[in-house]
Amino acid sequence: MPSFTSKTLLAALAGAAAVNAHGHVKNVVVNGASFQGYDINSFPYTQNPPKVAAWTASNTDNGFVGPESFASSDIICHKNSANAQGRIVVAAGDSVFVQWDTWPESHHGPVIDYLASCGNTGCDKIEKTALEFFKIAEAGLVNGAQAPGRWASDVLIDNNNSWMIKIPANIRPGQYVLRHEIIALHSGGDLNGAQNYPQCFNIEVTGSGTVLPQGVKGTSLYTPTDAGIRFNIYRSLDSYPIPGPALPAGFAPVAQGSSAIVSSATAITGAATNAPAPIATTTAVNVVPSPTTIVTSVVQTSAAQTSAVQTAVPVQTSTRPISTRPQPTRCPGLGRRHLRKVARA
């Protein structure tokens, strides 16, 4: 008969396999050119991995950053993150299409996008705790009539696990860290139950814009008790307070669609360049399926630090819990940590 220890180990391994379903950004597409992301399955074990625009991180289990770590540097660009040594040139006004390898349907929540200027230091050298992030887009609750609701994360799944981010046309040229994040709220009703999945990339914005909004240090973006962090999704909802600093006036999410990949490209390195944004070649290597475009709208509240995202579809105005509400989904990663504690006992 297997020992308790061996049973515990098998359960832990099963939990680890389930955690790997969370996902990470595998590549970024700009004007049809696909740039490789940080490959958590090979780069950490490669002596000289390629220089990419995606920041490195130690989330080899596709894990998350919990609210208990919001004051630590892990929340900035994920656990033990380090500067990317490459960057992608993007013209102001262009879109960046990020493709996740997968995302679990049960992990409902908002999708938020930030920029942080690297100034004259360069994003490959800047200290991450010095970065000050401002929002360029946010999307949250799409329809809350029936728990757990339809969320931006569901739109991402329907869009082939991908998300379109528009770089503001009036943004000042320079090097920036693009911070793309999904916040999973399936356990958000519990203190420290939310799960943040930040993904960072170095970009160089070209153009003649002059706008550079005031930013917030990454370690000050959220607190564990923010209304949009400790949030129960298992009830009918008519709104959701997206966490983080307010979205600057004039910035908004774009219609979600697809982006054809017609070439592969390599991130550039070294000093800043005045080169134009990458233009795709005519040699097709892959095409992303084109799902139905889904649009969300933003309801801004300039006096508040949060704003709600809804569609024009009417939703229930009652926020009371429904009588037969679904039960929160327990993340396998939490069970795995519990099993480790039991094995050590």
UniProtKB/Swiss-Prot annotation:
Glycans are attached at N160. Cu(2+) binds at H22, H107, Y197. Transmembrane segments: none annotated. The keyword Methyltransferase does not apply. It is found in: Secreted. Keywords: Carbohydrate metabolism, Cellulose degradation, Copper, Disulfide bond, Glycoprotein, Metal-binding, Monooxygenase, Oxidoreductase, Polysaccharide degradation, Secreted, Signal. Residues 1-21 form the signal peptide. It catalyses: [(1->4)-beta-D-glucosyl]n+m + reduced acceptor + O2 = 4-dehydro-beta-D-glucosyl-[(1->4)-beta-D-glucosyl]n-1 + [(1->4)-beta-D-glucosyl]m + acceptor + H2O. Residues 335-345 have a biased composition (Basic residues). Disulfide bonds join C77-C200. InterPro entries: AA9, AA9_LPMO. Binds 1 copper ion per subunit. Residues 315-345 are annotated as: Disordered. It comes from the Eukaryota. GO terms for molecular function: metal ion binding; monooxygenase activity. O2 binds at H186, Q195. Its cofactor is Cu(2+). Its main location: secreted. Its EC number is 1.14.99.56. Lignocellulose is the most abundant polymeric composite on Earth and is a recalcitrant but promising renewable substrate for industrial biotechnology applications. Together with cellobiose dehydrogenases (CDHs) an enzymatic system capable of oxidative cellulose cleavage is formed, which increases the efficiency of cellulases and put LPMOs at focus of biofuel research. PANTHER family: ENDO-BETA-1,4-GLUCANASE D, PUTATIVE (AFU_ORTHOLOGUE AFUA_1G12560)-RELATED. This is AA9 family lytic polysaccharide monooxygenase D. It comes from Podospora anserina (strain S / ATCC MYA-4624 / DSM 980 / FGSC 10383).
